Amino acid sequence: MSIEQFAKEFSAYAKLNEYVKALADGEIVEMECTQVEDENDWYTVIGYVIETAEPVEDSNGDYTAVNVYYSAVDADKDPYDDEQYKDADSAESAVQSAYMALVEERQELVNDFWRCY
């Protein structure tokens, strides 16, 4: 592994780590009011809760993106209703898992680099 290759991959991991960590800082990551039709019923979406987050490999095996899946938060429901936010803990856990996976991948990259030199 060349120094240039190592620097490129390490930089990519660092950027993804920052992105995933930022997602992990809040359960509702995007606030907006939109009308959504769901089974013939309209409701207002006030934000989105992260369901899962996972790093994505490109065809070269580099991690170049993070897939994040959201579920809508319904404004017509009680915002303190535990049922509505029941997945928030698991969502946060999924983001933390994605972050830790990236940290581990980055550490493996460092270890591989030092084995070469």
Label each residue range with its predicted role:
Residues F6-E9, K15, Y19-A22, T64, ...:
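Charge-rich, solvent-exposed alpha-helical interaction surfaces
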